[in-house]
Amino acid sequence: MKKILDWYNWIKFNWLRKVQLVDIDYVDVSKDPVRPNLDLKFRTSYGRKIYGLKYENEIVGVICVAYTNDIPTTEKELDLMSKVSYYEKNSNTAIAYTVWSHKKGAGKKIMEEAKKFLKGKADRIVTLSPLTPMATHYHIRNGAKLINLNPTTQNFEYKL
């Protein structure tokens, strides 16, 4: 029975071997389950980036990253810190402030690919996550460590 399950899982998730992380300049922000209030201009200005997990010709996962030199606890701090770091050219921390996927397995894979991509570009990768059980479980399952519990958010850190 174990061999059958192993084979089934291999077939079911084999597509993950064929994905790549790409820099994208457009995403339908209304599909963002975490921060749909942040418009496209916010996500692509002041050095902020949108990365997509591409499988064949489809984006199956999205991660939005801002570059700062400190750890924000609110969206306002994220905005201000990323602007300051952009102008001073001194960012050392990648802040993943939203992650979502359209295909099972893509959420975990996009974080793995983002960590590989950001290694050497940032000293650390930290999240600005909502205070929800889903966000907590996602980050803990993917190997992150809770470093701050804030009034409206939480920060997790991933090892690069």
Regions found by a protein language model. Give the residues of each.
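Conserved catalytic-core motifs of GNAT/GCN5-like acyltransferases
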Residues: 145-158
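Conserved beta-strand-loop-alpha-helix junction that forms the acyl-donor binding cleft
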Residues: 101, 126-137, 150-153
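Conserved N-terminal entry element of GNAT/NAT acetyltransferase domains
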Residues: 1-25
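Conserved acetyl-CoA-binding loop-helix of GNAT-fold acetyltransferases
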Residues: 101-118
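Conserved acyl-donor/pantetheine-binding loop and adjacent beta-alpha core of acyl/acetyltransferases
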Residues: 64-95
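Conserved GNAT-fold acetyl-CoA-binding loop/helix
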Residues: 18-38
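A short helix-loop-beta-strand connector motif used in the catalytic cores of GNAT acetyltransferases and
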Residues: 40-61, 66-73
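Conserved GNAT acetyl-CoA-binding A-motif
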Residues: 94, 119-131
